[in-house]
Amino acid sequence: MDFILTYLNTLIASLAALAGIISIYYLIREMQEQNKVARANARQNVSDSHQEIALKGMTPRMVKIKMKLRNNEDLSPEEDAAYLTYFSIMLRSRENQHYQYSIGMIDAGEWENYQKSFKTLFKSEYHLKLWSFMKDTFNEDFIKIVDGIIDENN
């Protein structure tokens, strides 16, 4: 009788251990799925933010300012202030994208695509002037990335 009780006790302990392992496996799988969902949400938020900024850049006032910049015309003090704010918001969005990338919420390929827009953005002397004015307000790692892209362009 002791043999049967020992055997049953061992069998039950083994089944409990197996159930624990299976539970851990399913917990890991669930965490992986939640991570995928979180990454997709981060990407969507970045996309929404980018779209919102792009739409702000399409207002008649901002289009006029952009056309002046493209034609190397001087901006009025009011236009300069408005564009400084717009440019700052645009860079803050990129800084947030870098943060999302640094914590693994945006993959490397996507981050590389985001960086491509910097290459055209910082060909403008006006944008370089704005960047030098405001760069100290950004995260050090982000500053290094932007400065590296600027150096690469020049």
Residue ranges of predicted features:
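An amphipathic alpha-helical interaction surface
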Residues: 78-154
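Membrane-proximal alpha-helical anchors
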Residues: 2-75
